């Protein structure tokens, strides 16, 4: 064993001391042959050895304690060194290595904490943007869904024939307001058309009743004329008087025929008005179809806006994923810091290990909070995306209802075309009645001429009376034909027109159709 190896080992030096003390005891015992002296010499040697060893050990421990205390106080730049080359020197070298490692780890942790704080700041900003986007999306989704539901309810009622329905256009969304205004304008024009057709139908009914009543009176007068002719035939002596009476009756018939002709002319004018109303209704329905096409285009624009919002939600989702990845990396860094703290504590530096562990726990806590915030952002984005899809579905449902409304308007246009055909038939019937009335007037005139001839030629009284009777019967048949035609006209064309108009519910007060009426508000004038 060399002197150098003894200096590098505290145990070796202590062993050499004990050997020297034992040698001293042996020497004293051999020389003095006295046990007491030997014991005293042994105790003195041990005390001397212990004092020297204790002094060196205490000095080394004091020196290391002072240096490690400065490290514990945060001075990681101090260099730990010792003049000893034994285990205490090795301990000083180990503490120096721990100091350097701790300083490097703390530098890394400071950098990691700075990165984590920046990530936390970015996460807070992203969360604020996500919350603002969520609020905006919720408001937009709720507003569009409510408006679409209200529009759908009103359009469904209108499709069932209730033309008094209007939508509330008081909304901050231009696209939906345009849809509502177009629908209300279409319903106003369609209701005005139906009201016009209804009014004309009522006038036709009233005037047809008047013509029918006039025909009945004419028929009664014709029957009276027939009886008069019979009296002429049976009472030849009163022939002249009866003929004069018949002439008067014929004049009444002629006047009635002229009245019928005038009424038929007026009815023809009314029929022309109905034709014009039907044409206006057809034009209004075609305009309504154009408006419905515009409504479909506006609804498509609304769907495009919602799809753009979905794309923004996808971008925010990508940002949240990046934040989650940063949080996971920070969490791994915190785990490494915890391992280093445990390692530092295992090497005997409890205070250093605890301080290192506190920093690691703080980093881990920040990482977990960042991960939690990122998860919340992802949850919010998922909810906003779901609501956006619901808005898209609602708008698409509105498009479907608009298509249904378009089909309804097309059906109404077909019905109006049918009404126009019925009006054409009415006009044809009126023309036939006009021709029949003209024939009746000619017949009455011929009858008057016949009565004049009978008056001038009494000898031909019987023959003329027979001709008169024949002419009057023919006239009665004509009047009956007119009456039957009017009844048929009333039962078929007019009633069919009224039944078709009654399919629609309209507001009798034409000023009540305002675009600012509440959705589904009841009609002011009641239903027809």
Swiss-Prot record:
The name this protein carries in UniProt is Sensory rhodopsin I transducer
Quick check: keyword Transmembrane in the entry?
yes
Record has Mitochondrion as a keyword? no
Which SMART domains does this entry report, sorted A to Z?
HAMP (SM00304), MA (SM00283)
Record-annotated Methyl-accepting transducer domain positions? 214-455
Keywords, in A-Z order: Cell membrane, Membrane, Methylation, Repeat, Transducer, Transmembrane, Transmembrane helix
This chain is encoded by the gene named htr1
Domain (HAMP): give its ranges. 55-107, 142-195
Q: Where are the transmembrane segments?
A: 11-31, 35-55
How does the record classify its membrane topology? Multi-pass membrane protein
Q: Which GO terms describe its biological process?
A: chemotaxis; signal transduction
What triggers or suppresses the expression of this protein?
A: Expressed constitutively throughout the growth phases, both in presence and absence of white light.
Cellular component terms per the entry's GO annotation: plasma membrane
GO MF annotation: an example: transmembrane signaling receptor activity
Q: Which residues carry this modification: Glutamate methyl ester (Glu)?
A: 259
Cellular compartment(s): Cell membrane
Which InterPro entries has this protein been placed in?
A: Chemotax_Me-accpt_rcpt (IPR004090), HAMP_dom (IPR003660), MCPsignal_dom (IPR004089)
Q: Which organism is it from?
A: Haloarcula marismortui (strain ATCC 43049 / DSM 3752 / JCM 8966 / VKM B-1809) (Halobacterium marismortui)
Please describe what this protein does: Transduces signals from the phototaxis receptor sensory rhodopsin I (Sop1).
Subunit composition and interactions:
Interacts with Sop1.
Q: Which PANTHER family match?
A: LYSOZYME-LIKE PROTEIN-RELATED, METHYL-ACCEPTING CHEMOTAXIS PROTEIN MCPB
Into which family does the record put it?
A: Belongs to the methyl-accepting chemotaxis (MCP) protein family.
């Amino acid at each position: 064993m060399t002197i150098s190896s003894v200096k590098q080992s505290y145990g070796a030096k202590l062993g050499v001391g004990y050997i020297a003390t034992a040698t001293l005891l042996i020497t004293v015992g051999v020389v003095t042959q006295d046990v007491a002296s030997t014991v005293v010499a042994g105790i003195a040697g041990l005390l001397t050895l212990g004092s020297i060893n204790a002094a060196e050990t205490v000095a080394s421990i004091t020196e290391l304690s002072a240096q490690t205390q400065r490290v514990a106080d945060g001075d990681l730049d101090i260099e730990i060194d010792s003049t000893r080359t034994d285990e205490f020197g090795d301990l000083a070298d180990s503490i120096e290595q721990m100091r350097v490692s701790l300083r490097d780890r703390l530098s890394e942790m400071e950098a990691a904490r700075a990165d984590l704080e920046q990530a936390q700041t970015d996460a807070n900003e992203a969360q604020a943007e996500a919350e603002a986007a969520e609020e905006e999306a919720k408001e937009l989704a709720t507003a569009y869904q409510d408006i679409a539901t209200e529009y759908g309810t009103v359009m469904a009622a209108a499709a069932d024939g209730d033309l008094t329905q209007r939508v509330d256009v008081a909304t901050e969304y231009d696209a939906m307001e345009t849809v509502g205004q177009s629908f209300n304008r279409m319903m106003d024009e369609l209701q005005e058309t139906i009201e016009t057709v209804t009014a004309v139908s009522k006038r036709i009914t009233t005037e047809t009743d008047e013509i029918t009543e006039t025909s009945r009176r004419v028929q009664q007068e014709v029957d009276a004329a027939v009886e008069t002719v019979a009296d002429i035939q049976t009472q030849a002596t009163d022939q002249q008087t009866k003929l004069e009476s018949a002439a008067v009756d014929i004049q009444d018939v002629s006047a009635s025929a002229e009245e019928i002709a005038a009424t038929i002319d007026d009815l023809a004018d009314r029929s022309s008005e109905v034709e014009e109303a039907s044409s206006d209704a057809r034009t209004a329905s075609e305009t309504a179809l154009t408006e419905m096409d515009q409504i479909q285009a506006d609804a498509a624009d609304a769907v495009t806006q919602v799809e753009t919002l979905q794309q923004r939600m996808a971008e925010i989702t990508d940002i949240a994923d990046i934040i989650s990845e940063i949080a996971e990396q920070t969490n791994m860094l915190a785990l490494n810091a915890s391992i280093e703290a445990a390692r530092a504590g295992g090497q005997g530096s409890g205070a250093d290990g605890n301080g290192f562990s506190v920093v690691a726990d703080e980093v881990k806590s920040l990482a977990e909070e960042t991960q939690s915030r990122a998860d919340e952002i992802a949850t919010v984005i998922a909810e906003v995306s779901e609501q956006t899809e619901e808005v898209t579905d609602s708008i698409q449902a509105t498009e479907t209802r608009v298509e249904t409304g378009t089909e309804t308007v097309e059906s109404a246009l077909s019905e109006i075309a049918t009404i126009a055909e019925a009006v054409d038939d009415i006009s044809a019937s009126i023309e036939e009645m006009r021709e029949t009335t003209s024939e009746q007037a000619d017949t009455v005139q011929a009858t008057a001429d016949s009565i004049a001839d009978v008056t001038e030629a009494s000898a031909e009284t019987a023959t003329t009376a027979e001709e008169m009777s024949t002419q009057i019967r023919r006239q009665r048949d004509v009047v009956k034909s007119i009456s039957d035609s009017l009844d048929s006209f009333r039962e078929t064309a007019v009633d069919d027109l009224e039944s078709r108009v009654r399919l629609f519910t309209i507001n009798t007060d034409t000023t009540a159709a305002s675009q600012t009426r509440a959705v589904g508000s009841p009609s002011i004038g009641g239903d027809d």
